[in-house]
Amino acid sequence: TEYRMYEDVAVVLKEYGYHQYEISNYAKAGCECRHNEGYWQRKDYLGLGLGAASLLGKERFSNTSDMQEYLKNSSAPEKIQKNWELLTREDEMAEFMFLGLRMTQGVSKKEFQEYFGTAIENIYGEVLKKYKKQGLLLEESGRIFLSREGIHVSNAVMADFLL
């Protein structure tokens, strides 16, 4: 089965010195993909070029995918930016959770509290309780993360964090 193959590959990768640092990636220590980590941690990024996406603070947008439009307006960034949205607090909370849970280190309760001004349990208490009880989420050293079993059903778990 796919589950067994996934677990077998994980064993082989570990034997060769790789560690799982996100639910779909392995790397040797110090060689983790910084781009992915920045994305999962919701750090600002600026996409340059045709169709490139950006997240700057609470603003998310992408550049046009139309080459003619892009070339015609490339000196005026506001004319090539499409799909602009201002993220709400709820959007940011949901992204904090479902993007952060993609990393094996999970999410920091302290960082959630500092950024949003409220405890993670005040927003997601029932969801956290449900998945901890099922053994799909674990908590250790102030971090909440997917268990090994939770990784296999991560999409279902993460969907419950959408507000």
Question: Where in this protein do the model-derived segments appear?
Answer:
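C-terminal scaffold of the Radical SAM
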Residues: 1-118
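Minor-groove-contacting beta-hairpin "wing" of winged helix-turn-helix DNA-binding domains
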Residues: 143-147
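Short amphipathic alpha-helical interaction segments
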Residues: 117-132
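A short, conserved structural fragment
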Residues: 132-142
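Short, amphipathic alpha-helical interaction segments positioned at domain boundaries
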Residues: 149-163
